[in-house]
Amino acid sequence: MQDGKIALVTGAGSGVGRAAAVTLARDGWHVVAVGRRTDPLAETVAECEREGGSGSAVTADVSDPASVETLFERVRADHGRLDLLFNNAGTAAPPVPVDELDVEQWQRVVDVNLTGSFLCARQAFGLMKTQDPSGGRIINNGSVSAHVPRLHSAPYTATKHAITGLTKSLSLDGRPFGITCGQIDIGNASTPLTARMPEGVLQADGSIRPEPTMDAADVGRAVAYMASLPPDANVLTMTVMANGMPFIGRG
């Protein structure tokens, strides 16, 4: 159990973020649930409490530096420390050929997936380095697309590859301060973003075929395991995916 420890989960209003928040709360973490919409965050906190845990909701836009700074100022004021950051917030662009993609669509994915993770990690480092005792853990939400792309997914795939570089850099930079960083690469968790998969999605050969999904709660348990390790151990990378999905052999 992680009684008394503070976890911050971005994108906590639904899907993997909510699943991770609830599992962490069940394990004794106090979860700061972060997202852009108030009502879904309130539902996440209520579910944390139904599971016997505790949580609080904070609205913030991870792509906005000022919003992220305000978020972490509140964490410092309310809790005095941060033991875990789960950089989960993410988005994707329409699945169109790259020459049909608007620059604004590209930029939005970069702003949320990559810059948002950087902004939160930057603030977390500042808090984790100076708190007493110092140290903490960051877990970044990557994707199986950090290894193998889908067709028409340039913004998403590029940002998830970049998350891998960010994860490794943070892991190295955090060593002197007891800050660990790892990455969970997820494939086809059942969330609003993957709702279309059982009906059929575009494959590398141009065909449309259904794909299996897995319960997001399984990902929540994986995140909680990574978070539960002692300070002298770290899962640098973990891949968890729906059994039978086209990943190995994809393309």
Protein language model features and the residues they cover:
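Residue(s) in the substrate-gating loop at a strand-loop-helix junction
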Residues: 143
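C-terminal helical subdomain
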Residues: 183-184, 202-248
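Active-site helix of classical SDR
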Residues: 121, 159
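The beta1-alpha1 cofactor-binding region of Rossmann-like NAD(H)/NADP(H)-dependent oxidoreductases
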Residues: 59-71, 103
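Conserved glycine-rich cofactor-binding loop
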Residues: 13-15
